[in-house]
Amino acid sequence: MAGEITSIVSQLGLTPEVFLILVIFTFVVIAAIVVVVVTVPILKIYPYLNPISRVRARKGRLLTEKQISELVETSDISEVENYLSGIPDYSDIAEGESVEKTLDTKMGETYDVVARLVPKDIAPAFKVFSKKSDISNIKSLLAAKAVGLNQDETSDLLIPTGKLYEDIERLTDVNSVNDVVAGLDNTEYANVLSEALPIYEEKKVLLPLDSALDKYYLQSLLKARVVPSEANTEILYSYLGNQVDVANINLIIRAKADKLDYDELEPY
């Protein structure tokens, strides 16, 4: 066998040293190909490994079925507050926060955390989710000024989270809905609010402004819907569909409360 190899090397005009180098180079190339084939799939899923572990860790902090059953069995809101105050994530309730405000704050914080930790290719959708807190605060601010609440009363309605929280909080001392819209002139919501403001001034109901914010949020979500796989797309589309349904149901309820007929409701 060794003699045959030596004969082949001689026929090719190669010295033993050159032949050895070629053999080593061939093995290196094959090894490199194997490494690439093995590592490329791993690199594709690597950005998801840390987010998945962190999401699972947060999932482990969700209320258990037993805890939810015990909450259902409470007799009044005071018992609900006492029960939740014993859970670390909701201990703020014991410090004077209302249940609703605490839960809204936790939701906003969760959206912010997820938006920061997810891989870049799916981050846009989660960044839009994190806008929910700002939109909720703008709605609360508009509602407060529509009924003439003062600065302290308005501040109590705000959720202390969101990218624009400080800007919105500074507007708690303004006097009217028009002042709120003017104060948000440098934000991404300026155009949609300005376009809806004349309808509010005509009808004196907040529905046009609230609906404009909801539409902007859902349209932003649809624009950011691209995700890496078909399975993820299906999950996200299902969530988007539920968001649209909830927005439309809330809109119908608001419209009925404001005694609007179909022709007045349909544009929203």
Positions of predicted regions on the chain:
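N-terminal domain-start signal
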Residues: 2-268
